[in-house]
Design a protein with these regions (language model features):
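Short "domain-exit" segments at the C-terminal end of structured domains
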Residues: 138-142
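N-terminal, polar/charged subdomain of small-to-medium soluble alpha/beta proteins
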Residues: 1-133, 137
Length: 142
């Protein structure tokens, strides 16, 4: 995030989701555990002053949303899981201006000892300015 914009964070750590993502058919059929870490960039100041949840992002709702999204969709790549999940969180939670999202896959089919593999991304809203230039010309005279 840019310095001075939404430096407040709501963090979700190790959200466990059982879902069916993977390149191999057995991953899609059997499913496996995924762990999600998310940092939501937002302005918590109004909610903190007023002690009012309606002025903040309800992290319980975000956890439920991520879980349901990951369980209702099947993707081959955890890169896709991360991209689509981040997009949907930004679309559904208007006070979230950006997020860091990590999808961990500790049961990945790797025939070597390992702790986990993961994809971590950062996505945020950007202001866009659209300039419309209309060129009106007079008819040419012969």
């Amino acid at each position: 995030m840019k310095k001075g914009t939404y430096e407040d964070q709501i963090r979700i750590e190790e959200l466990e989701v059982y879902a069916h993502h993977g390149v191999y058919p057995e991953e899609n059929e059997k499913g496996q555990h995924f762990y999600v870490n998310a940092t939501l960039y937002t302005n918590t100041h109004p909610a903190g002053l007023a002690d009012d949840l309606s002025l903040s992002t309800n992290y319980g709702e975000v956890c439920q949303f991520i879980t349901e999204f990951m369980q209702q969709h099947t993707f081959q790549l955890i890169e896709t899981v991360a991209e689509r999940t981040a997009y949907e969180v930004l679309q559904h939670f208007p006070l979230v201006q950006g997020l860091d999202l990590e999808i961990r896959k500790p049961e990945a089919p790797i025939p070597l000892p390992f702790g986990s593999v993961s994809v971590a991304i950062h996505r945020e809203w950007h202001e866009a300015y659209i300039l419309s230039l209309i060129h009106i010309s007079e008819p040419t005279r012969p």
